[in-house]
């Protein structure tokens, strides 16, 4: 089976041991100041304005199955006017005949599109991705633990910092440094800022686990690392001091509009969904997913109204209570 198809197969099977969003309770408002139709969902990040605060995050490509998922979700994104980010463009660079990425642009004129490349790649690979897909921005993903567990993974990482610096110097579209489900520490964000990165997708634990995926692909020797990393809520709590200095995108374990709003309350500029969208693509028609996503927009407005927040910025004024391991983490940072 194609490696990308194996990723899809095991991503669909995985269920996290816990979700940090369940450790967070928002304090509601009974007498709001705004009507529902006054609630503004728009957000700004990576030098772009988006009408809605959530998007379809990087997932797949590089196989027939990946192509069909990209095709379906790109159509959903276009019809719903939300952002769609492809998986790593490396697959297309390795195989010139691969059209699993091109199809999203070709079939969806005006699509809000981002794409993705690994930090192990030379900046010229990023330039090619930008040239081919003409995205609004380029994600640079860092996937250290995946590489370490992956049977055929890289063991050489000392060029990543230099590669990121060269991306910053040479790529003409905005850049986002992205984790892949293990979370991003304040030290990593500060290092990225020093290298010139302005936007970070912290992609915490709680959703897709590439440790689990690579364990299932291999001999499962490292199953004790399946829950490696920091949860999404823990990452956001740990990055409170960075919220006003850089742009933080939240992803990892986001299941529905309440999780989206919780991430925005903690200071995220926007929220990405991967595993949730993958499951929707696997189990629903394009029309059904469009209906679900359009409903999410209204549900986000409803929750914001119940929190007396007219816009995403005002969500940061919402009080909340933490429980369990997430509360313990918050007391020790």
Where are the model-predicted features located?
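An N-cap/entry alpha-helix motif that binds or orients negatively charged groups
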Residues: 1-46, 50, 325-326, 331-333
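Active-site cofactor/substrate anionic-group-binding motifs, chiefly glycine-
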Residues: 45-91
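Conserved, mostly hydrophobic/aromatic
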Residues: 56, 77, 138, 200, ...
């Amino acid at each position: 089976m194609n490696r990308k198809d194996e990723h899809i197969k095991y991503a669909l099977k995985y269920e996290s041991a816990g979700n940090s969003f369940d450790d967070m309770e928002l304090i509601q408002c009974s007498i709001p100041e705004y009507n529902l139709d006054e609630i503004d969902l728009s957000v700004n990040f990576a030098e772009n304005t988006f009408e809605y605060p959530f998007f379809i995050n990087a997932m797949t490509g590089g196989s027939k199955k990946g192509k069909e998922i990209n095709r379906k979700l790109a159509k959903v994104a276009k019809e719903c006017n939300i952002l769609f980010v492809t998986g790593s463009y490396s697959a297309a660079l390795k195989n010139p005949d691969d059209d699993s990425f091109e199809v999203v642009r070709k079939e969806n004129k005006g699509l809000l599109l981002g794409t993705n490349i690994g930090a192990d790649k030379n900046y010229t690979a990023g330039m090619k991705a930008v040239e081919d897909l003409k995205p609004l921005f380029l994600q640079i993903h860092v996937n250290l633990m995946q590489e370490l567990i992956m049977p055929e993974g890289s063991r050489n990482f000392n060029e990543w910092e230099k590669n990121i610096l060269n991306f910053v110097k040479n790529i003409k579209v905005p850049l986002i440094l992205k984790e892949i489900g293990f979370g991003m520490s304040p030290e990593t964000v500060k290092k990225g800022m020093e290298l010139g990165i302005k936007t970070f997708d912290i992609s915490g634990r709680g959703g897709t686990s590439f440790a689990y995926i690579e364990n299932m692909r291999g001999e499962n020797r490292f199953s004790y690392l399946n829950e490696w990393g920091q949860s999404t809520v823990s990452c956001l709590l740990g990055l409170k001091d960075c919220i006003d200095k850089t742009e933080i995108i939240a992803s990892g374990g986001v299941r529905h509009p309440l999780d989206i709003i919780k991430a925005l309350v903690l200071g995220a500029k926007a929220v990405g969904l991967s595993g949730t969208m993958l499951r929707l693509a696997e189990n629903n028609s394009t029309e059904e997913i469009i209906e679900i996503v359009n409903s999410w927009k209204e549900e986000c407005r409803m929750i914001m109204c119940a929190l007396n927040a007219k816009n995403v910025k005002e969500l940061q004024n919402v009080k909340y209570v933490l429980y369990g391991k997430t509360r313990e983490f918050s007391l020790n940072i």
